[in-house]
């Protein structure tokens, strides 16, 4: 994931910064507890495509 792109991307719902999880290839919104997938190098920033993170799943960084 391009670091410059990460600097400008925000959560489409709450506008919070996103964390990049390389192993899962996802962008994480800590505020909304959503994981947005990255497919073929393209972040899919649609709420319907996001995975809701369970409360017990730790979000680090």
Swiss-Prot record:
InterPro entries: Trm112-like. GO terms for cellular component: cytosol. Disulfide bonds: none annotated. Belongs to the UPF0434 family. HAMAP family: UPF0434 (MF_01187). This is UPF0434 protein Nmul_A1027. It comes from Nitrosospira multiformis (strain ATCC 25196 / NCIMB 11849 / C 71).
């Amino acid at each position: 994931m391009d670091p410059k792109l990460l600097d400008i991307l925000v959560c489409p719902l709450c506008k919070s910064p996103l964390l990049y999880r390389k192993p899962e290839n996802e962008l994480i919104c800590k505020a909304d507890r959503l994981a947005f997938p990255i497919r073929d190098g393209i972040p899919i920033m649609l709420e319907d495509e996001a995975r809701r993170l369970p409360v017990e799943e730790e979000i680090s960084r």
